[in-house]
Amino acid sequence: MMSVVKGRLLGLGVGPGDPELITLKALRLLRAAPVVGYFVAKGKKGNAFGIIEAHLDQAQVRLPLVYPVTTEKLEPPLCYETIISDFYDTAAEQLAAHLDAGRDVAVICEGDPFFYGSYMYLHDRLATRYESEVVPGVCSMLGGAAVLGAPLVYRNQSLSVLSGVLPEEELRRRLADADAAVVMKLGRNFDKVRRVLVELGLERRALYVERATMANQRIVPLERVEPMASPYFSLIVVPGDKWQGGAGGE
């Protein structure tokens, strides 16, 4: 009896939201994949799936990976880390069933798979068992800088990418030391982040955008953002000071 050649695991970055920002390579592999997996909240279609839906044909298997309805703050004996780890274990085995049957599986990921992408957790579980390939995508901070018209770093400057979930003192220290910064994962952390920016005198350089490159993108002055209304898909760009050697003259 001949053994079945296992399928390939593909992690495809599909860009920050604008469907035209998917790469040619990701699109080619997506169209050729028998199975397409995508992360989604219960009852939702999902942003990543919305980006690529028009490129799929009826023969391709759609495999939604539905996040558990939970929160990071749970009462004992429940634990967010355990629940989400179990979810990724189960999702990985769903993919493995197709891979073992010889079917390639493309897992789509908004932005870039290895930049805060949920695909990473499947890659950690499966890449040692199956042939895999990761296709990079345009990540949200680059989409954000583009729509804001804000060059991130000049010449020898360094860029710090920070998570809004950092403790306030740690966030303050890192922003104070940064030539330029992008703060991700705002949501309910927005008020803390804005407070730190004001304390450091960075609020005038700081630029805020929600859902960069998506159809419902919003660019709002930092002082006018409602803290409780800041969505997960929002970020703040603090560009580096302009390099005078590149400044144009009159």
UniProtKB/Swiss-Prot annotation:
Chain coiled-coil ranges: none
Catalysed transformations (reactions): precorrin-2 + S-adenosyl-L-methionine = precorrin-3A + S-adenosyl-L-homocysteine + H(+)
Superkingdom, natural source: Bacteria
Keywords on record: Cobalamin biosynthesis, Methyltransferase, S-adenosyl-L-methionine, Transferase
Enzymatic class: transferase
Keyword Kinase listed: no
Family matches, as InterPro entries: 4pyrrol_Mease, 4pyrrol_Methylase_sf, 4pyrrole_Mease_sub1, 4pyrrole_Mease_sub2, CobI/CbiL, CobI/CbiL/CobIJ_dom
Statement: the UniProt record of this protein carries the keyword Zinc: no
EC number: 2.1.1.130
Pathway: Cofactor biosynthesis; adenosylcobalamin biosynthesis; cob(II)yrinate a,c-diamide from precorrin-2 (aerobic route): step 1/10
Pfam families on file: TP_methylase
GO biological process: cobalamin biosynthetic process; methylation
Disulfide-bond pairs as recorded: none
GO MF annotation terms: precorrin-2 C20-methyltransferase activity
Assembly behavior: Homodimer.
Similarity section: Belongs to the precorrin methyltransferase family.
Protein name according to UniProt: Precorrin-2 C(20)-methyltransferase
Organism: Pseudomonas aeruginosa (strain ATCC 15692 / DSM 22644 / CIP 104116 / JCM 14847 / LMG 12228 / 1C / PRS 101 / PAO1)
Gene designation per UniProt: cobI
